[in-house]
């Protein structure tokens, strides 16, 4: 009796069960079924697989560079099965590497450019100046007094005599001619400025020169009475303490007076000194 009742009750329970109870359980019950999610649309598992294939392809390519003997067939098959995404990634990496190299080269090229786009001219290295000895300068100056331009034979002779090179002799004579030209231009400018001043300005200059001469003579630095300052033309200079005229002006001296004789001797002494400054022996 009990077995029959149980058999009758079992079909009734089966009727009361929901039809969902007969469905198989999902493979992953924790993950919800979302067929329209972003991951399902983009097929994320395949993307991960392509990334893994790309990494393997890069490793195999590096191994191919270091070991040219060849790769196994499995590795070459893996390289041939890379996805288009892997190829795109490799192409992008090569492109960016090329851009980085070009940017670095352009930056290095801009270092040599100025703000206005003009390339900096390299500074010329100055040659070291030749230090001439006193004997060499004396011999060169002595030769320059009567010969401003040298012939090749004279140049070789001077260079051999003084222990210099031909280039050093040529350079010294060029610089000396330029210095002489500057000195002549300065003297010419001084003469022109003196002419513009007029007689009064020239008289003032002569008076200042006489004052300097008298101060040197009183201080004991006159060099034995031989001064280099020029006297005023037409009126001999009077030493300190000379007698004056009653009106307060300087006393006019006769040509035969002792003061005029002293002035004439001082002029002769100055001329002798100027003649002795340059002594040239050919």
Curated annotation (Swiss-Prot):
Keywords: Developmental protein, Differentiation, DNA-binding, Homeobox, Myogenesis, Neurogenesis, Nucleus, Transcription, Transcription regulation
Predominant cellular place of this UniProt entry's protein: nucleus
Compositional bias annotation for Basic and acidic residues: 1-20
Disruption-associated phenotype: Death at birth. Mice fail to expand their lungs and do not move their abnormally thin limbs.
Transmembrane segments: none
InterPro entries, A to Z: HD, Homeobox_CS, Homeodomain-like_sf, HTH_motif, LBX_TF
Known role: Transcription factor required for the development of GABAergic interneurons in the dorsal horn of the spinal cord and migration and further development of hypaxial muscle precursor cells for limb muscles, diaphragm and hypoglossal cord.
Feature: compositional bias, Acidic residues: 269-282
Gene3D superfamilies reported for this sequence: Homeodomain-like
GO BP annotations, alphabetical order: cell population proliferation; glutamatergic neuron differentiation; heart looping; muscle organ development; negative regulation of cell population proliferation; negative regulation of glutamatergic neuron differentiation; neuron fate commitment; neuron fate determination
Annotated CDD domains: homeodomain
Official protein name in the record: Transcription factor LBX1
GO cellular component: nucleus; transcription regulator complex
Tissue: Expressed in the dorsal part of the spinal cord and hindbrain and in presumptive myogenic cells in lateral regions of differentiating somites.
DNA-binding region: 125-184
Localization (cell): Nucleus
Region: Disordered, residue numbers: 1-36, 210-282
Ranges of Gly residues composition bias in the record: 218-227
Single Gene Ontology MF annotation: DNA binding
Subunit relationships: Interacts with SKOR1 which acts as a transcriptional corepressor.
């Amino acid at each position: 009796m009990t077995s029959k009742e149980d058999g009758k009750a079992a079909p009734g329970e089966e009727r009361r069960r929901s039809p969902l109870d007969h469905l198989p359980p999902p493979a992953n019950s924790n993950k919800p079924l979302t067929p329209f999610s972003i991951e399902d649309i983009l097929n994320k598992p395949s993307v991960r697989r392509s990334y893994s294939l790309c990494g393997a392809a890069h490793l195999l390519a590096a191994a191919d560079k270091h070991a040219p003997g060849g790769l196994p067939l499995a590795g070459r098959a893996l390289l041939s099965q890379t996805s288009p995404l892997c190829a795109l990634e490799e192409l992008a990496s090569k492109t960016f590497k090329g851009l980085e190299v070009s940017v670095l080269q352009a930056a290095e090229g801009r270092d040599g450019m100025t703000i206005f786009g003009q390339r900096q001219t390299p500074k010329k290295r100055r040659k070291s100046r030749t230090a001439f000895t006193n004997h060499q300068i004396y011999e060169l100056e002595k030769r320059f007094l009567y010969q401003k331009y040298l012939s090749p034979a004279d140049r070789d002779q001077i260079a051999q005599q003084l222990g210099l090179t031909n280039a050093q002799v040529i350079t010294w004579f060029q610089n000396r001619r330029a210095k002489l030209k500057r000195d002549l231009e300065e003297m010419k400018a001084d003469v022109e400025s003196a002419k513009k001043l007029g007689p009064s300005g020239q008289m003032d200059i002569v008076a200042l020169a006489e004052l300097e001469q008298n101060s040197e003579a009183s201080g004991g630095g006159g060099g034995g009475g031989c001064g280099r300052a020029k006297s005023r033309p037409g009126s001999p200079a009077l030493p300190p303490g000379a007698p004056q005229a009653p009106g307060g002006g300087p006393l006019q001296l006769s040509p035969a007076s002792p003061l005029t004789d002293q002035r004439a001797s001082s002029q002769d002494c100055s001329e002798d000194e100027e003649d002795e400054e340059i002594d040239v022996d050919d």
